[in-house]
């Protein structure tokens, strides 16, 4: 396992790359994010996030263009007192990313040349899933976790 770390958060790079490669292949151009939203929701559940902590808002019903889904929101309790933290990324990609076929070239992930990659959006999503996997054991120790 390739692990990058600093004093606070070790990062499982191999897992992040696996999630990224998967997410890059899931369709999700702007307005059509239902498939990638479902894939991310499923990945979060697989790393231990309770389904009750995952929700979608109704932003898609309040904007003037047709969209499939609202924002994916995950509410998790903290591990210590203090102000809440927000981690944010986006799910959608530009139309040039439709049908993306990512591949590895050494330590790089690239498109096959027929589409754009969509790595900006999906890298953030993969990182958040891996960070949740890393912290889930500590979060589960917080009183009230089972009440979600």
Regions found by a protein language model. Name each.
Residues 26-28, 58, 89, 148:
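Short glycine-centered, acidic/aromatic-flanked micro-motifs in structured strand/loop junctions
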Residues 43, 68, 75-77, 81-148:
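Active-site metal-coordination/substrate-binding segment of hydrolases
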Residues 22-29, 45-50, 133-140:
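Generic secondary-structure signature for well-ordered alpha-helical cores
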Residues 2-32:
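N-terminal capping segment at the start of a domain
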Residues 29-79:
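A non-catalytic alpha/beta surface segment that caps or lines the substrate-entry region
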Residues 12-19, 32-40, 70, 83, ...:
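General structural feature for long, well-ordered alpha-helical segments within catalytic domains
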Residues 21-25, 56, 109, 113-116:
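Short amphipathic alpha-helical segments at helix-loop
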């Amino acid at each position: 396992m390739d692990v990058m770390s600093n004093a606070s958060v070790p990062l499982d790079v191999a897992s992040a790359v696996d999630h990224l490669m998967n997410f890059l292949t899931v369709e999700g151009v702007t307005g059509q994010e239902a498939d990638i939203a479902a894939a991310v929701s499923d990945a979060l559940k697989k790393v231990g996030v309770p389904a009750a902590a995952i929700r979608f808002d109704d932003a898609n019903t309040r904007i003037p263009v047709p969209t499939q889904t609202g924002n994916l929101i995950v509410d998790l309790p903290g591990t210590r007192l203090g102000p809440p933290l927000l981690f944010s990324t986006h799910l959608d990609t530009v139309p040039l990313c439709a049908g993306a076929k990512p591949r590895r070239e050494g330590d790089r992930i690239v498109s096959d040349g027929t589409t754009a990659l969509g790595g900006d959006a999906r890298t953030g999503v993969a990182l958040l899933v891996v960070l949740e996997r890393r912290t889930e054991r500590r979060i589960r120790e917080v009183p009230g976790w089972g009440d979600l």
